[in-house]
Design a protein with these regions (language model features):
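Conserved nucleotide-sugar phosphate-binding/catalytic loop shared by glycosyltransferases and other
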Residues: 1-44
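Structural motif corresponding to alpha-helix initiation and N-cap regions
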Residues: 5, 52-56, 108
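Short loop/helix-cap segments at secondary-structure boundaries that form the rim of catalytic
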Residues: 9-15, 76-83, 115, 138-142
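Short, well-ordered beta-strand core segments
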Residues: 20, 70, 85, 121-122, ...
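Conserved nucleotide-sugar donor-binding subdomain of glycosyltransferases
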Residues: 35-77
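Short beta-strand elements of ligand-binding domains
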Residues: 73, 87-89
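A nucleotide-sugar donor-handling region in carbohydrate enzymes
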Residues: 89, 94-156
């Protein structure tokens, strides 16, 4: 298993018998204002480099440890052509700006392109009107490899 920060600590506590690898990601900074356009735009080079770096690091990890399945929790670069790769997200549509529908649609298309690199996309929500994620997962058409898996929670 690979993660960083609190998710890594949770995985180590939950699965102490399994190997855990620290896999850092960049810190994302959001604006306190409604629009995230400029804050996200300024971070695009950092995101692109991080995606490239994590994808290359993953190749080495797969080779070194003989990984046969990857489950990525919203990490864009954690897919591998030769290994079953699953992407988990509740956000198919990305709301970059509440007022700019064209920009939000462009963000959706870019995210869909990322999702299509994976074998499957799991959406932790319910299909239909009784759902938790609203427009984030239900506004735009789902990629062909995406489906709803119900609520995922460690709480019982």
């Amino acid at each position: 298993m690979a993660a960083d920060g609190y998710p890594l600590l949770l995985l180590q506590k939950t699965f102490p018998q399994l190997l855990c690898i620290e896999f850092k990601w960049v810190d994302i900074h959001y604006s306190k204002a409604n629009s995230q356009v400029l804050p996200i735009m300024w971070q695009i080079p950092k995101f692109m480099y991080a995606i490239f770096r994590e994808h290359n690091t993953l190749k080495h990890i797969v080779d070194a440890y003989g990984i046969d399945t990857i489950i990525s929790d919203n990490r864009f670069g954690l897919w591998h052509k030769k290994v079953k790769s699953i992407y988990i997200t509740h956000q198919i549509g990305v709301i970059v700006s509440p007022k700019n529908k064209a920009l939000n649609y462009l963000a959706y298309l870019l995210h869909k392109k990322i999702i299509n690199r994976y074998d499957e996309c799991w959406i932790p929500d319910f299909e239909g009107t009784d759902n938790l994620s609203g427009d984030l997962s239900h506004k735009y058409p789902l990629p062909e490899n995406a489906y709803f898996v119900g609520i995922l929670s460690r709480f019982q």
